Amino acid sequence: MEFIPAQTYYNRRYQPRPWTQRPTIQVIRPKPRRRRPAGQLAQLISAVSRLALRTVPQKPRRTRKIKKQKQVKQEQQSTRNQKKKAPKQKQTQKKKRPGRRERMCMKIENDCIFEVKHEGKVTGYACLVGDKVMKPAHVKGTIDNADLAKLAFKRSSKYDLECAQIPVHMKSDASKFTHEKPEGYYNWHHGAVQYSGGRFTIPTGAGKPGDSGRPIFDNKGRVVAIVLGGANEGTRTALSVVTWNKDIVTKITPEGSVEWSLALPVMCLLANTTFPCSQPPCAPCCYEKKPEETLRMLEDNVMQPGYYQLLDSALACSQHRQRRNARENFNVYKVTRPYLAHCPDCGEGHSCHSPIALERIRSEATDGTLKIQVSLQIGIKTADSHDWTKLRYMDSHTPVDADRSGLFVRTSAPCTITGTMGHFILARCPKGETLTVGFVDSRRISHTCMHPFHHEPPLIGREKFHSRPQHGKELPCSTYVHTTAATTEEIEVHMPPDTPDYTLMTQQAGNVKITVDGQTVRYKCKCDGSNEGLITTDKVINNCKVDQCHTAVTNHKKWQYNSPLTPRNSEQGDRKGKIHIPFPLVNTTCRVPKARNPTVTYGKNRVTLLLYPDHPTLLSYRAMGRIPDYHEEWITSKKEISITVPAEGLEVTWGNNDPYKYWPQLSTNGTAHGHPHEIILYYYELYPTTTIAVLAAASIVVASLVGLSLGMCICARRRCITPYELTPGATIPFLLGILCCVKTAKAASYYEAATYLWNEQQPLFWLQLLIPLSAAIVVCNCLKLLPCCCKTLTFLAVMSIGARTVSAYEHATVIPNTVGVPYKTLVSRPGYSPMVLEMELQSVTLEPTLFLDYITCEYKTITPSPYVKCCGTAECKAKNLPDYNCKVFTGVYPFMWGGAYCFCDAENTQLSEAHVEKSESCKTEFASAYRAHTASVSAKLRVFYQGNNITVSAYANGDHAVTVKDAKFVIGPLSSAWSPFDNKIVVYKGEVYNMDYPPFGAGRPGQFGDIQSRTPDSKDVYANTQLILQRPAAGAIHVPYSQAPSGFKYWLKEKGASLQHTAPFGCQIATNPVRAVNCAVGNIPVSIDIPDAAFTRVTDAPSVTDMSCEVASCTHSSDFGGAAVIKYTASKKGKCAVHSLTNAVTIREPNVDVEGTAQLQIAFSTALASAEFKVQICSTQVHCSATCHPPKDHIVNYPSPHTTLGVQDISTTAMSWVQKITGGVGLVVAIAALILIIVLCVSFSRH
């Protein structure tokens, strides 16, 4: 809140006044102000009187001709004056009168802005806004006002702003500010500013460095923004500003913005005297005049911030302004030269000193382009002039030109050269294990150099294609941009060493003659004492032999690359220079192909994909539940794959296409409202395990009951026929024989049996007569009681729970954390009509709190030119460099192309150095290691409230309240404190990986984190690459070493799939900032505070009566596949809320209009085969019963909008069949039990 000025109104004086120290209020005299209107009136009266008495001048045409003739005479008199006056006329034409907007801004600025000066130069401005003085933080200097310069400013790096409280006596000069910014045109010092699409733009050229801090005003003179800088976008320039949005400060920074503070002069040093780097002293002031002294001056200032300004100034000797072109980019190469260096394989299997030695091969670009550094120079001729068609190479001691057309690069096949400049070549090459560069010189001789190098073009995307398609998808990648302009990348150069050349010496009798050939030669002879020196003319050394002398050519007028294949200049030591190099690595987009869409066949809980890859294409899929079960496979030919679709959904990614998402539906071949075998098939396909278990248990129970019934019948039969079997000559009655299946010799008639029982056993006669009647009574009672049991079973199966209601305006509910599925809640309040609230999650974002431990990337090994100490011993010095190694090797005898480098045989030593730095690619190709802490959850919620759909965003923490019209919603916290991110994560190019990386300062060679830095631009670097210097080979000058491979590049190959593809619950992972979006896990509680005015009293709402519900059609587990028609009678016209009191049924309409006697149709969605639900309209409820059929589609591409209760539904038809089967089995058991009871009673009565 420090950067939001308080709004105070003060009357402004219209006449501007100079900025001086303000006197106290008592000193200001108001008398001149009271007299000012009278003076103005007198001036107005006199001006009107002069205008009235003024006469029209006569013959105006003649006077104009006279003026014209005078001009012609003046032109004819002096042609020199005419030439001098012409530029003055142009200057007067450029000087335009300020427009209305500029005049108004200048008038306001005279009071409210102050210059910020540094060493007498204006670097920017400070502005008085409200009760604060504001100044851009990047503007260096002090405010040009004694009172304001003393203030203590508070700094905000986030907004690039500094502010302080305005002194009391200056508050009247401050401008008001506003957060109201309708699109249109605003005013600033240089004219109009257009505000559109949340951006401020001006015509290109209207603003410049030094304008930082200027305010932008509206037409009322209020400040709407403060300018910080701008970004050139062609004809328009987008402004970087600080502005206000209600109670928040906002910084708008277009891409590519540059700060508009006036650059301060950078100072350089020469002989303990400082001077501006852009204006070097006259001695030396130009490389062309004094090359050696100029290079020395540059080496002295190589670490100064203005080194490149000094280099440009020293090379641009001409004082007049030159037109910039591509040649200026090559101007720096006139201070350098090509060189000869050692090559391990010059094309015939042997080493040599090659003019096209390979220094470095860079392959960081993900588009497969190689950047090759060689010892020759391309695009520069020997005369230091620019020529695209030429290259220059070192032949002996002098550079020689050759045609660029003879340059070639190859791996396993010829490469395509896409760019060349200086020491660098850009080429696109096929895969191979070696790389060869070469050229044909002017004598038609081919020079080549081959290095072992494993090259395989990297994979972009998920398809291994060979050529860029015409149409496809743009993916982020990196490439070497084809520009020869100065970049941030640089190489080190130094003075070349003395090059030995024994051909300069000839033996003449007993003397040695040294022929210099116009060169500077250093010689040393061991004959008749020490004889050494530096000569530019031929010299004869008497009484000496060639074997006793050593000659070397010295050239200190040019730099050469600091190569490990050439020795360091022994006199210069560590002195060096720097030059920019072309073709920087930048982030861009690459077009990749999109695989043909697969042929998709839907099955029951399965999806079958028929794939047609044009080239190897990656197929991956994951479940969107708790266990993602991620799989991936490279498809190289036509293939059919069948994948199971879980209930939570399936995400399939084919090639570079966007992911396909599938959800299963409760489809089946049977029906829940058919015959038993169809019902069994229906439930078996939906719930196979449960169906088998239920059928097995039911079969066991039925079999047990039937067996029990048979046992009771057998027991009763035995009891009945035993007395007749034991009685000789007894005759079994006819009816008993039929019931007990007993064979009789003579069957008695029913009349005879009845007569016998009447005479002998009258109780048995009555019992036998009541058996059919008892059976009928038992069956009727069983059928009567079965529905009661079935209602209990149905309740347990369906578990339909009514919606929660409250008796107050404070309402709480819980919605599932599923995006795109609407949820409704009913708010009932006594005395008021019920209110329906519909809520739908648009998105849910889980954002962890991150702490950056470090970034890691590919390293480069810096091996400076070795220092060879001839006839002596070199010593290592400690240096604070990452992974620094230094070793001194004795007994070396290095050779250069002209002979032995040293005069001694065995007393020479070589000092080899090496250390590690971040590669140039680290600015674009790096991975960030973060520690993740507590995550914050925010939700975007669509609320249907009072007939309006309103979308709000809030933190789901249970504390943050958002207002929807006049109601307050508090969301969260989530029921599950779950996050897809581990405690340690790695972010690389928009992808996130869970990884237990090593801490800062504990990296291991060849693994992730072998080189670490706080940020991509920071200088603090930790490295552990197992760098070990090795002894150089005999005769060669080089710096061999052993080192572990880059852990970053190894991690890129082995990192696997990112969280975007493997996160559970269907999370979508995004970066900038790192977050997980739409994770379908847990529930979100919502607390709603609804004011009394939002409710409608029962007396004001229509009364609905005579309601009836009829379901026209119903398809369960489908997107609102049910349609119900409700007939009603309303007391008056009005609007009623519609709500389902059953959680298993969701109604699409939140409210309906009712009037008179009519009917309305509602759409509902349910997962039940037999839906029994209540619909409430206003305060009246109606019961609906639906017989739903399964959907025809097995798979859909959207989640179900209904609530899944997690239990199996039993249809009414299935329940009726269960009742029938249960009743039949129960009847059989009851009859068998009754028979057994009667038989037992009769047999016990006999005894």
Swiss-Prot record:
This is Structural polyprotein. Residues 53-103 are annotated as: Disordered. Disulfide bonds join 112-127, 268-277, 282-286, 285-317, 343-449, 346-352, 415-429, 477-590, 525-549, 527-544, 720-741, 857-922, 870-902, 871-904, 876-886, 1067-1079, 1109-1184, 1114-1188, 1136-1178. It catalyses: Autocatalytic release of the core protein from the N-terminus of the togavirus structural polyprotein by hydrolysis of a -Trp-|-Ser- bond. Residues 83-113 are annotated as: Binding to the viral RNA. The record marks 186, 219 as: Involved in dimerization of the capsid protein. Residues 154-159 are annotated as: Interaction with spike glycoprotein E2. It comes from O'nyong-nyong virus (strain Igbo Ora). Residues 325-691, 748-762, 809-1223 are extracellular. Residues 36-67 are annotated as: Host transcription inhibition. Residues 98-112 are annotated as: Ribosome-binding. Residues 715-719 are annotated as: Interaction with the capsid protein. The lineage of its organism: Viruses, Riboviria, Orthornavirae, Kitrinoviricota, Alsuviricetes. GO terms for cellular component: host cell cytoplasm; host cell nucleus; host cell plasma membrane; membrane; T=4 icosahedral viral capsid; virion membrane. Residues 261-273 are annotated as: Functions as an uncleaved signal peptide for the precursor of protein E3/E2.
